[in-house]
Amino acid sequence: MCHAAPARPGDGRGLPRAGDNFSGAARSKPVGAAFEQRARQFLERRGLVFVAANVTMRGGELDLVMREPDGMLVFVEVRARRSARHGGAAASVGWRKRRRLVAAALQFWARHGAGAACRFDVVAFEAGQLAWLRDAFRADDA
């Protein structure tokens, strides 16, 4: 179903400042939405087409669903951390989270994209920097 793609580093434009405080439950949804919007804009500037956001399927939620020009579906998990302490943003996508993402993605794929190849990317915001991890994990890794 999913296959590997070459990595492409992010350019870091349009990011929060390093001193921004985006912790706390009261701000988590609006702040998360802001990071998802920045991730979406970043990916669109690189040629991906927006399909859906915040899709809740049985078993999990998909932050962003994008499509490559060749038709490949891209399921994007967006993570933000103020620092690399405790592993950082990308490392926070552990095996439990990957399992939930894969379950949700498989349902979405079956309903809306069966036949298309797909992959799982992570857009990580950490200390004011953006990293785009293409093909961050595979369905059989979860």
Curated annotation (Swiss-Prot):
Outline the segment boundaries, as ranges, of region: Disordered. Answer: 1-27
Instruction: Extract the SUPFAM superfamilies matched here.
Output: Restriction endonuclease-like
Coiled-coil segments? none
Example of a GO MF term: nucleic acid binding
Q: In which domain of life is the source organism classified?
A: Bacteria
Q: Which InterPro entries match?
A: Restrct_endonuc-II-like, tRNA_endonuc-like_dom_sf, UPF0102_YraN-like
- What HAMAP family would the database entry show? UPF0102 (MF_00048)
- Which family would the database say this protein is a member of? Belongs to the UPF0102 family.
PANTHER family found in the cross-reference section: UPF0102 PROTEIN YRAN (PTHR34039:SF1)
Which protein, by its recorded name, is this? UPF0102 protein Bcep18194_A3391
